[in-house]
Amino acid sequence: MPIKTFEFSSVDGRRFVKPTDRWVNLRVDHNSTVTLISELGDRQASVDFRFTANYHASEAVVGLIQIEGNILWEGDAKGLVKGWSAGGQMPPDVAQEIHTVIMTNCIPEAVLLARELRLPPPIPIPQVNVPQQPGKPAKGRSPEIA
């Protein structure tokens, strides 16, 4: 794994509506963007990024969470910087790895920040479905939920 370090440089969260307001058709979009790639040596590159979670309802913008940071990537740094400088492109395998690391680290941070701002978490919450069994369950027993 060529990712050597990962660090946050800026964490910003805003709620634009009152916490008591009810929203219709709330949609949460999250995005990771590489903003700059610079060469630190033959084998290392610095990758600056921005993660954004936008909260949109049908009638208003509800909130915004934005996280910026830096990744130290190890590999063919010259080739990565050359491709990025020429057209803002990374090789698909490198792009997948970098964006996966960004999302893996930023989404948990965004969940904590959303809780503090009284916004819904920027990930879907799993729904628990308890199957209905015919007949009456035994007294004092409850279904097991895994």
Which functions belong to the PLM regions below?
Residues 1-100, 115-146:
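N-terminal intrinsically disordered, cationic/polar leader segments
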